[in-house]
Amino acid sequence: MRDETPEQPAPLRFGYTTGSCASATSLAAARLLLTGVASDTVDIVLPKGQHVAMRLAFCRATDDGGAEAGTIKDAGDDPDVTHGALVFARVRLVHEPGVRFRAGPGVGTVTRAGLPIAVGEPAINPVPRRMMTEHLAALAAEHGYAGGFDVAIGVENGEALARKTMNPRLGIVGGLSILGTTGIVRPFSCSAYIASIHQGIDVARANGVTHIAACTGNASEDAVRARYGLPDIALIEMGDFAGAVLKYLRRASVARLTLCGGFGKLSKLAAGHLDLHSRHSSIDLPLLAEWAGEAGASAVLQHEIRAANTSQQALALALAHHVPLGDVVCAHARRVARDIVPGEVDVETLAIDREGRIVGVAP
């Protein structure tokens, strides 16, 4: 009997950003107004020069003399909150040249300073705005049109979807943001999450926040909120991306930073890992045993910690013997952070257990 050959996994599919969807639908609607031709697909050029054809769900005239077009957002194999959502554009021709952007249903409006879009503007980021403007300008030139375009971008159920994003905390109300820098969604890319971390820091700074807390999850946010009473705008949901916070503070510093996370996550940071996800870093139990020794653990206890199954078991062993392992881990984590952020930033680290109790502090 021959050995079975495992199937090779299919390559992950790329998708398209909401910015690409907005560009395609606004172009299709505008073309209908200028030519009378309703398209099934529309070709657009992405920021790096790639040409793509996007399929439309509809392209039709509206009762107010305008036109609208929609497309189903395909994020490829990326677990994107907007995957499968209907992104649409409603376009009207206006006398004044240029493009005026409006937030349609399901697209948010900026209410706080610190984002790349001014307060009061629809949450359509700079690159999607540029993409739409360039495509519409080329269309106008092609058909000798000297007027402008009123463009409203919407996302079906966008207001509900936005509650699953960081938009409410960033001060974007009423819906989603239209995003994208390359026009392409890369499967399981971290870039969008890291960008939201940076935006959170920018918004906090622009609104006068001097103490921010970067947290790995909801439990650590609750612990920081209970300890300091910080407002939501000061809480940065960093997840596993500690490095994204620390490195960004080199160019956008604050007076005070609190880093808070589960004991296991903080032990990874203490060991020098800046990506705390299990795919990229692991718990170093021998190192935890060594640190327990720094905190006064006996040789026997160090051996037990080294043989523990999890970081939580190691912590429980230490606490049962009144060894402040959490404080030592936090001190090492603070040292790692201190080596990255500017000297003027006051850094503190907090570790919590699975019940959300603070088990380590390094002020």
From Swiss-Prot:
Signal peptide: none annotated. One of its GO terms (biological process) is methylation. GO terms for molecular function: cobalt-precorrin-5B C1-methyltransferase activity. Pfam families: CbiD (PF01888). It catalyses: Co-precorrin-5B + S-adenosyl-L-methionine = Co-precorrin-6A + S-adenosyl-L-homocysteine. Keywords: Cobalamin biosynthesis, Methyltransferase, S-adenosyl-L-methionine, Transferase. InterPro entries: CbiD, CbiD_sf. It comes from the Bacteria. PANTHER family: COBALT-PRECORRIN-5B C(1)-METHYLTRANSFERASE. Belongs to the CbiD family. This is Cobalt-precorrin-5B C(1)-methyltransferase. It comes from Burkholderia pseudomallei (strain K96243). The lineage of its organism: Bacteria, Pseudomonadati, Pseudomonadota, Betaproteobacteria, Burkholderiales. The gene is cbiD.
